[in-house]
Amino acid sequence: PYDCKNVIFTGGEPMLNDLWPIARVLKRRGYHLSVESNGTVEVPDGLLDWICISPKDQMYPNVAIRQRTGDELKCVYVGQPLSLYDDLKDGFDHLFLQPCYDEAMSVEKNGRSFAITEDVVKNNPEWRLSLQTHKWMGIL
Protein backbone atom coordinates (compact mmCIF):
# COMPACT_ATOMS: atom_id res chain seq x y z
CA PRO A 1 0.00 0.00 0.00
CA TYR A 2 0.98 3.58 -0.60
CA ASP A 3 1.53 5.44 2.68
CA CYS A 4 0.97 8.98 1.42
CA LYS A 5 -1.69 10.76 3.46
CA ASN A 6 -1.72 14.02 1.46
CA VAL A 7 -4.13 14.69 -1.39
CA ILE A 8 -4.13 17.88 -3.46
CA PHE A 9 -7.10 18.60 -5.69
CA THR A 10 -5.81 20.59 -8.66
CA GLY A 11 -5.75 20.67 -12.44
CA GLY A 12 -8.25 22.54 -14.52
CA GLU A 13 -10.53 24.07 -11.92
CA PRO A 14 -11.13 21.44 -9.22
CA MET A 15 -13.95 23.39 -7.58
CA LEU A 16 -16.14 22.81 -10.65
CA ASN A 17 -16.29 19.13 -9.66
CA ASP A 18 -18.25 17.52 -6.84
CA LEU A 19 -15.23 16.72 -4.67
CA TRP A 20 -17.10 16.39 -1.40
CA PRO A 21 -18.08 12.69 -1.47
CA ILE A 22 -14.47 11.57 -2.02
CA ALA A 23 -13.13 14.29 0.28
CA ARG A 24 -15.35 13.11 3.13
CA VAL A 25 -14.16 9.51 2.70
CA LEU A 26 -10.51 10.59 2.58
CA LYS A 27 -10.92 12.83 5.62
CA ARG A 28 -12.44 9.97 7.65
CA ARG A 29 -9.40 7.89 6.70
CA GLY A 30 -7.02 10.51 8.06
CA TYR A 31 -5.88 12.27 4.90
CA HIS A 32 -4.66 15.87 4.76
CA LEU A 33 -6.66 17.53 1.98
CA SER A 34 -5.57 20.56 -0.04
CA VAL A 35 -6.92 22.38 -3.06
CA GLU A 36 -5.32 24.69 -5.60
CA SER A 37 -8.04 26.72 -7.25
CA ASN A 38 -8.27 29.85 -9.38
CA GLY A 39 -10.68 31.24 -6.78
CA THR A 40 -13.68 31.74 -9.07
CA VAL A 41 -15.73 29.23 -7.04
CA GLU A 42 -16.00 29.57 -3.27
CA VAL A 43 -14.58 26.66 -1.28
CA PRO A 44 -17.01 25.27 1.33
CA ASP A 45 -15.81 25.56 4.92
CA GLY A 46 -14.56 22.77 7.06
CA LEU A 47 -13.40 19.90 4.89
CA LEU A 48 -10.06 21.06 3.46
CA ASP A 49 -6.87 21.54 5.46
CA TRP A 50 -5.11 23.88 3.02
CA ILE A 51 -6.53 26.28 0.43
CA CYS A 52 -4.27 27.76 -2.23
CA ILE A 53 -5.79 30.35 -4.54
CA SER A 54 -3.95 31.10 -7.76
CA PRO A 55 -5.94 33.73 -9.68
CA LYS A 56 -5.64 33.75 -13.45
CA ASP A 57 -6.18 37.52 -13.52
CA GLN A 58 -3.56 38.11 -16.19
CA MET A 59 -5.45 35.75 -18.55
CA TYR A 60 -9.03 36.56 -17.45
CA PRO A 61 -9.04 40.08 -15.99
CA ASN A 62 -12.84 40.37 -15.78
CA VAL A 63 -13.47 37.17 -13.80
CA ALA A 64 -14.38 37.75 -10.14
CA ILE A 65 -12.42 36.04 -7.38
CA ARG A 66 -15.01 34.59 -4.99
CA GLN A 67 -12.70 32.73 -2.60
CA ARG A 68 -11.24 35.58 -0.59
CA THR A 69 -9.61 33.65 2.24
CA GLY A 70 -7.21 30.76 2.46
CA ASP A 71 -3.76 29.65 3.41
CA GLU A 72 -1.89 30.69 0.29
CA LEU A 73 -2.33 33.29 -2.45
CA LYS A 74 -0.09 32.43 -5.40
CA CYS A 75 0.11 34.86 -8.32
CA VAL A 76 2.02 34.61 -11.59
CA TYR A 77 3.89 37.88 -12.03
CA VAL A 78 3.78 39.48 -15.46
CA GLY A 79 4.48 43.05 -14.38
CA GLN A 80 1.09 43.85 -12.89
CA PRO A 81 1.02 46.27 -9.94
CA LEU A 82 0.85 44.39 -6.65
CA SER A 83 -1.87 46.82 -5.58
CA LEU A 84 -4.13 44.65 -7.75
CA TYR A 85 -4.17 42.23 -4.79
CA ASP A 86 -4.65 44.78 -1.99
CA ASP A 87 -8.29 43.86 -1.41
CA LEU A 88 -7.50 40.14 -1.51
CA LYS A 89 -4.16 39.53 0.21
CA ASP A 90 -5.27 40.18 3.80
CA GLY A 91 -7.40 37.04 3.69
CA PHE A 92 -4.35 34.80 3.18
CA ASP A 93 -1.54 33.67 5.47
CA HIS A 94 1.12 33.28 2.76
CA LEU A 95 1.66 35.41 -0.36
CA PHE A 96 3.71 34.10 -3.30
CA LEU A 97 4.78 35.65 -6.61
CA GLN A 98 5.88 33.36 -9.41
CA PRO A 99 7.84 34.63 -12.41
CA CYS A 100 5.95 33.96 -15.60
CA TYR A 101 7.65 31.19 -17.52
CA ASP A 102 6.86 31.00 -21.22
CA GLU A 103 8.20 28.01 -23.14
CA ALA A 104 8.04 30.09 -26.33
CA MET A 105 10.52 32.62 -24.90
CA SER A 106 14.29 32.28 -24.85
CA VAL A 107 16.20 31.24 -21.77
CA GLU A 108 17.44 34.83 -21.48
CA LYS A 109 13.92 36.31 -21.50
CA ASN A 110 12.68 33.79 -18.95
CA GLY A 111 15.76 34.58 -16.86
CA ARG A 112 14.89 38.28 -17.03
CA SER A 113 11.34 37.47 -15.91
CA PHE A 114 12.81 35.62 -12.93
CA ALA A 115 15.16 38.51 -12.06
CA ILE A 116 12.37 41.10 -12.29
CA THR A 117 10.10 39.03 -10.05
CA GLU A 118 12.95 38.48 -7.60
CA ASP A 119 13.49 42.27 -7.38
CA VAL A 120 9.77 42.88 -6.83
CA VAL A 121 9.77 40.36 -3.97
CA LYS A 122 12.89 41.93 -2.43
CA ASN A 123 11.12 45.31 -2.47
CA ASN A 124 7.84 43.89 -1.14
CA PRO A 125 8.84 41.58 1.72
CA GLU A 126 5.31 40.43 2.53
CA TRP A 127 5.53 38.46 -0.75
CA ARG A 128 7.77 35.44 -1.23
CA LEU A 129 9.26 34.04 -4.41
CA SER A 130 7.88 30.78 -5.76
CA LEU A 131 8.67 28.97 -9.00
CA GLN A 132 6.49 27.07 -11.42
CA THR A 133 9.09 24.32 -11.13
CA HIS A 134 7.33 21.98 -13.53
CA LYS A 135 7.57 24.61 -16.27
CA TRP A 136 11.22 25.46 -15.63
CA MET A 137 11.99 21.73 -15.80
CA GLY A 138 10.04 21.29 -19.04
CA ILE A 139 7.33 19.13 -17.45
CA LEU A 140 4.33 20.90 -18.87
Model-based region annotation:
Residues 1-9:
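Glycine/small-residue-rich loop that forms an oxyanion/phosphate-binding "nest" at active or ligand-binding sites
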Residues 11-13:
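Short, glycine/charge-rich beta-strand/loop segments that flank catalytic centers
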Residues 5-6, 15-140:
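Conserved AdoMet/S-adenosylmethionine-binding subsite of the radical SAM
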